[in-house]
From Swiss-Prot:
Membership in a protein family: Belongs to the UQCC4 family.
Naturally occurring in which organism (per UniProt): Xenopus tropicalis
Transmembrane segments annotated in the record for this chain: 73-89
Entry-linked Pfam families: CCSMST1
Protein name: Ubiquinol-cytochrome-c reductase complex assembly factor 4
Length: 113
């Protein structure tokens, strides 16, 4: 009983191959990207395309709600910059010296204890 009820609507909703192919050709010919006259031996220029950094924004690709407000970005950037500068300019400690010792020397020290 359920099989006969479900088959009829599915058959009516399924588009035919001819209808789908006609829609695809109409869409291809009607789209502004359809270009017969472009010389395909030359490369496309990125600087003039819509993907260029002059045209692209986060709001265009991800939506305007994906942009982070400056008051969230600036403190994180300052913190990471501070940590990086501290790691570069700090003085070496005993721990650093122990880390840079060769493994053989550390094994000899542990055996002598």
């Amino acid at each position: 009983m359920w099989g006969s009820l479900c088959k009829a609507p599915l058959l009516r909703l399924r588009p035919t191959f001819a209808a789908v192919s006609n829609v695809k050709t109409i869409h291809i010919k009607a789209s502004p990207d359809y270009n017969e006259g472009i010389d395909k031996s030359k490369p496309l220029k990125f600087s003039t395309s819509k993907a260029s950094h002059r045209h692209w924004t986060v709001a265009k690709s991800l939506g305007s709600n994906q942009q982070r407000p400056w008051w969230k970005v600036v403190p994180l950037s300052v913190f990471l910059t501070t940590v990086l500068l501290w790691a570069i300019f700090r003085k070496e400690t005993d721990i650093d010296e122990a880390i840079y010792k060769p493994i053989e020397q550390l094994q000899d020290e542990s055996e002598n204890k």
